[in-house]
UniProtKB/Swiss-Prot annotation:
Top-level taxon of origin: Viruses
Species, as recorded: Mycobacterium phage L5 (Mycobacteriophage L5)
Name of the featured protein: Tail assembly protein Gp25
UniProt-annotated stretches for the region Disordered: 219-272
Disulfide bonds: none
Function text: Promotes tail assembly by creating a scaffold for the tail tube proteins. The tail assembly proteins Gp24 and Gp25 would wrap the linear tape measure protein to create a tail assembly scaffold. It would allow polymerization of tail tube protein during which Gp24 and Gp25 are released and therefore are absent from the mature virion. The tail assembly protein Gp25 is produced by a rare -1 ribosomal frameshift. The ratio Gp24/Gp25 is important for proper tail assembly.
Keyword Disulfide bond: no
Keywords: Viral release from host cell, Viral tail assembly
Subunit structure: Interacts with tail assembly protein Gp24 and tape measure protein.
UniProt similarity note: Belongs to the L5likevirus tail assembly protein family.
Gene Ontology annotations of biological process type: viral tail assembly; viral translational frameshifting
Amino acid sequence: MTNVFTIDAFREEVKKKYAPVLIGLSDDVTVELKPLLKLGQKAREAVVEVFKEFADIPDLEEDDDDELVDEYSLQVCDIIAKAFRLIATKPKKLIAALDEEPDPRIRAELYAAVLNTWKRETQLGGSRALAELIDKFGGAILADLLQYYRVDLRDLFRDEDPLSPRFVLSLVLCLPKDGAFYAERRGGQQYRGWTEDRYALADIYDAIQAGNHILLLANRDPKKPKPKAPKSYPRPDDLEKTTPKPGSFAAMVVRAKKAARERREREEESAE
């Protein structure tokens, strides 16, 4: 498993508190660049999509003319400006201040410098990976962190002295395999507790049952019916969806949905 914490990383965590990036535009104007984790899910996804646009900008060659280099530089500025509109508290003022630089190349470097500062100070790599995990398995991660580490995931979003994304991600990556997080990743809470040891015990149980069955068959009274074959120990992988019993609430819901679908299909055919 990847080691996301080194001695230098620990030193950085101790010396510096995790906080939003503040960009001073003047004595009385400050722009805050919000950490990725403090954005809404749609905004986070939009930021990720913006970064993908950099792949469309071709690599510069030594013999490229100045006009082409300037054009690429302006494209870089436009892409980063899209990100600023999503993460900055005052994006128009920030973009206007950066656009005061007339030289496209220097302007692009200014845009990139601000963006790289935000990426470094907010631990973008850890934030992005952790945000994706929380979006998918937030409840399970919350439960496991409290159970195994006594860490409250909500402290990640505190305004004062919040937990760092890299710290929380390290804990998540080392969660036990029999916990709620790994169960959700495998398909649901029915997998909780099903580690390699549990599967091995289930296999041993089945083998013992099979051996006992063979012994019964070999020593049974021919006049009596054969003993039934033993059932395998139930495993979460073997669980199948059962059809709702007639008359149950689930069956009525299924029947109502089917009737609504058939009625909608008839209406569509009549409209045609």
